[in-house]
């Protein structure tokens, strides 16, 4: 059996799908526990689908940022997270308004409340994305270092064998 992160693409899709499925189940359980009606399911499904899609876009952008200079990586990532939180919060607030306040205008306090939870959610997603990717980078560098050390040891042993060759003496 190969290590989980050997196929980085497969690992990403498995973690992405499992994470958002868990989020969906958690939100649904929270709604059921709070006694809300079944109409609550629709905004939760839309929210999870929007979050899944937004984090796919974030992942594609982060993939291009991760190899840049640190200031570009972290500055760009911060901007992307802020834009993603704004978009995700607007979708959540709009969906909640559509389902629960038919015909009501945009509610700024609902948007700000959504910003809080979505900042935590997308910030955690980003931290996991970078944490896992930096772990993979360090593992690859460790493997490369071990291979180089092995080559150096082999070269030293070959040199020693050559020096101890009786024909050399």
PLM-predicted stretches and their roles:
Residues 130-162:
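Cytosolic signal-transmission helices at domain junctions
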